[in-house]
Design a protein with these regions (language model features):
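Conserved kinase catalytic-core helix
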Residues: 95-133, 141
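A short, low-complexity linker immediately N-terminal to eukaryotic Hanks-type protein kinase catalytic domains
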Residues: 1-13
Length: 219
């Protein structure tokens, strides 16, 4: 039996969503939450501390998934957290992202950048975006498992720049498969807060698909 949030709502784990080196993730059907229960010996490097998890609970995001409520045992010991449950990940090939128009793809990707702007206001630096299993795609992209995210005292603009760079890296390698060298050149040339969405808006022809852009740019 576990206890969730300030009210001590009881939770008995039954439906396992997955497991890893840090712990197990369960489904809480009545509130549509994923509940991450960390193993007794918490890895201080890859697992969120109670203090960090509490701070993350106060950051409003939709696509960079952060803790929403903390989980405790019967003695009040912190064991994990809940987050919004997103339906099972689908293979990118199954949804054939390359056939999306760039207008549609941009509308999907810009959601990650909006969340990057939001977390930067709180001094949060996202991290570890290229590890296997750290994102979900079901028609939208979600970044999950913030175990290596960290708070920084740097200037908020500098944090935003770093977070945008991480999202750019995620999109370039996960979705575009680093096929368009011109994107890297543009990101270096424009610097600062230039995003891949900016590139797609600049370069897209009307109703062009992603595969059409790749074929046009990769000779």
């Amino acid at each position: 039996m576990y206890y969730i949030g300030d009210t001590g709502e009881t939770f008995t784990p039954e439906i396992v969503l997955g497991s890893g080196c840090e712990g197990k993730v369960y489904y809480k059907e009545d509130t549509n939450e994923a509940v991450k229960i960390q193993y007794n010996e918490i890895n201080k490097i890859t697992s969120l501390s109670e203090e960090s998890a509490l701070r993350l609970c106060n950051i409003p995001t939709n696509y960079i998934l952060l803790p929403r409520r903390l989980v405790y045992d019967e003695n009040g010991k912190y064991l994990g957290y809940t987050t919004t449950y997103i339906p099972k990940n689908k293979e990118i090939e199954e949804l054939d992202v390359q056939k999306y128009t760039l207008k549609t793809l941009t509308a999907i990707l810009i959601r990650l950048y909006k969340d990057a702007y939001e977390v930067s206001k709180y001094g949060l630096c996202i991290n570890d975006v290229l590890s296997d299993g750290n994102y979900i795609f079901n028609g939208s992209y979600y970044l999950i498992d913030p175990g290596l995210y960290y708070f920084s005292d740097k200037d908020k603009e500098e944090i935003l720049k770093e977070n945008i760079s991480k999202i750019n890296t995620f999109i370039n390698y996960t979705i575009l498969w680093d096929r368009i060298q011109e994107i890297q050149n543009k990101l270096i040339e424009r610097g600062s807060n230039y995003t891949i969405c900016d590139y797609l808006k600049d370069e897209a022809k009307e109703d062009e698909t992603l595969i059409g852009l790749i074929r046009r740019k990769v000779k």
